[in-house]
Amino acid sequence: NELIDSVGILKPFWEKLRMLRLGIAVDTVRIVHVGDSHIRGHIFPETTGGLLQRTFGALSYTDMGINGAFCTTFTRPDRVADIAALHPDLVILSFGTNESHNRRYNSILHYRQMEELVCMLRKSLPDVPMLMTTPPGSYDSFRQRRRRRTYKINPRTSVAVQTIRRFADA
């Protein structure tokens, strides 16, 4: 895993965590993790949130995942309002798996959908940094003769990863 923050957007967040760790900060640091079934499954977010809480103490880690979600799933005003109501210090956006499973995946459309979601979140949370994650590797399944299934690496996942990285770097 690699965390890229070439312009230092996350510096204020890291400073809040540092102050929390030193016992100087009294406010709870709030992280909201938004995404698809990887987030909805709770295993990764609960493990991450628990580790962060044990390490830093007064930290709230809320996951908002929806099975089968795309970026556009969260562009509804009520969903953006739900995220904003949590008053996060950091928003983590984890999408791309479901987008890349579409055999007609369109990176331009995916980019625009990310742009729409981030613009909506920026209006409600103008000073909150956003961290974008990329999807894990996945497989496409194919039915062969005699109803046997075979699997091969989904080639669209790497395109989705490149699209997300390009968007995050813009």
PLM regions: where:
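Alpha/beta-hydrolase-fold catalytic nucleophile elbow
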Residues: 94, 133-134
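Conserved SGNH/GDSL esterase-like catalytic core that processes O-acyl groups on lipids
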Residues: 28-119, 126, 139-141, 156
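Membrane/wall-proximal cationic-aromatic binding patches
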Residues: 1-33, 75-78
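Short glycine/proline-enriched coil/turn segments at helix->beta-strand junctions
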Residues: 126-127, 169
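Substrate-gating cap/lid alpha-helix
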Residues: 138-170
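Proline-centered loop/turn at the N-terminus of a beta-strand
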Residues: 129-131
